[in-house]
Amino acid sequence: MSKNLILILNCGSSSLKFAVLDPKTGDEKLSGLAEAFNLEDARIKWKLHGEKGNADLGAGAAHSEALTFIANELLSEELRSSIGAIGHRIVHGGEQFTSSVVINDDVVKGIEHAIQFAPLHNPAHLIGIKEAFRIFPELKEKNVAVFDTAFHQTMPEEAFLYALPYKLYKEHGIRRYGAHGTSHLFITSQVAELAGKPVDQTNAIICHLGNGGSVSVVRNGKCIDTSMGLTPLEGLVMGTRSGDIDPAIVFYLYKNLGMSMEQIEDTLVKKSGLLGLTEVTSDCRYAEDNYEDASKPEAKRALDVYSYRLAKYIGAYMAILGDDHLDAIAFTGGIGENSGHVRELALNHLKLFGVKLDVERNLAARFGKSGVITADDSTFKAVVIPTNEELVIAQDTAKLAL
């Protein structure tokens, strides 16, 4: 039997997303999510050959139990024997990894070294790798790491350096790394296809907007700047993350309000963003649904700040491209693909550049529908393109391990 399928694992600190798909066609045989790890109600849900199912994993279950369930209960002998390799999404690869790699001892050490930049995610990825080796021993030499930071490693120094003492970069690797690179890479290829150009001649500004959010600017198919920084905390307003703030706010919270560093980190990472601005929820849909409701001013406040910050990044990146033709401003991710309101508010700030929204096209582009959302006489195109990070991971894994 042909081993032409890829098992994809995306291990978070308390969850595991998984899929089995054909890297050539994108055909998905299995997909699912195991969540609430280490809690009483640890559970798993899946879609197998189009049929949905769910099960309890047992109190305290985590990555090991979830992967064991997938292997024993969801993968038939035929499906398992068709899997030729395993692709792991890795949030942070530091400077060491500029592309996807087959996992060996040195790669594991590199992922361990980058834990300092992704303390929640990278340890979970390492658990996923270890468990994949144990549960699928026949594929031990066929595990591939696909790094979210790799796409951004083409940034020039002026984009990735912070104006800090240079030795902090040379000795400790403190610099801009970015995130969501797998999504930005996929959307770049889709913009190229839309423009009828080779990827290495494509220029784009890509807005990946979900609970986390980032913008990148691409020249000739390569990332030249991105909004996330050393960690995924920098940049846009996000669901619970603050994005850009005056660094001195940290000193103020510590000295004047008596907050500990742990409390400050918790505030910036888990209690800010849309949640902080609304004081109700991190869900963008609340702000959209109540935007015109005068009795809920927090909704308009949150969406206006969110969209304004987004527009600032898009405008700055348009300036950075200079004379290079911009093929498209692309929106993707849960909010980018579905929130016509956010797209409208952000693009309305860019009229100086000749960006002209088509209201009907913008409203139509949602729920998985892609398309151009600007008017025919707009100076630049804005498009909505659903992302497919799993397909990129599968394709990279297939190139290296099949």
Curated annotation (Swiss-Prot):
Task: Name the positions where ATP binds.
Answer: K17, H208, L209, G210, N211, G212, D283, C284, R285, G334, I335, G336, E337, N338
* GO-annotated cellular components: cytosol
- Give the catalysed reaction(s), semicolon-separated: acetate + ATP = acetyl phosphate + ADP
Sites marked Transition state stabilizer: H180, R241
Which positions, given as ranges, span the membrane? none
Q: Entry's Pfam families?
A: Acetate_kinase
Q: Where is the catalytic site? A: D148 (proton donor/acceptor)
Highest taxon in the source lineage: Bacteria
Subcellular localization is given as: Cytoplasm
Q: Which GO terms describe its biological process?
A: acetate metabolic process; acetyl-CoA biosynthetic process
| UniProt key word Transferase | yes
Which InterPro entries does the protein's record reference?
Ac/propionate_kinase, Aliphatic_acid_kin_short-chain, Aliphatic_acid_kinase_CS, ATPase_NBD
Principal place of residence: cytoplasm
Q: How is the cofactor bound?
A: Mg(2+). Can also accept Mn(2+).
- State the pathway, as annotated in the record: Metabolic intermediate biosynthesis; acetyl-CoA biosynthesis; acetyl-CoA from acetate: step 1/2
Binding site residues for substrate: R89
Enzyme Commission number, as recorded: 2.7.2.1
Task: Supply the alphabetized keyword list.
Answer: ATP-binding, Cytoplasm, Kinase, Magnesium, Metal-binding, Nucleotide-binding, Transferase
Ribonucleoprotein as a keyword?
no
Name what cofactor the protein needs: Mg(2+); Mn(2+)
Q: Which GO terms describe its molecular function?
A: acetate kinase activity; ATP binding; magnesium ion binding
Its annotated function is as follows: Catalyzes the formation of acetyl phosphate from acetate and ATP. Can also catalyze the reverse reaction.
Spell out the family assignment given in the record's similarity comment. Answer: Belongs to the acetokinase family.
NCBIfam families from the UniProt entry = ackA
Q: What name is this protein filed under?
A: Acetate kinase
- Lineage, broadest ranks: Bacteria, Pseudomonadati, Pseudomonadota, Gammaproteobacteria, Pasteurellales
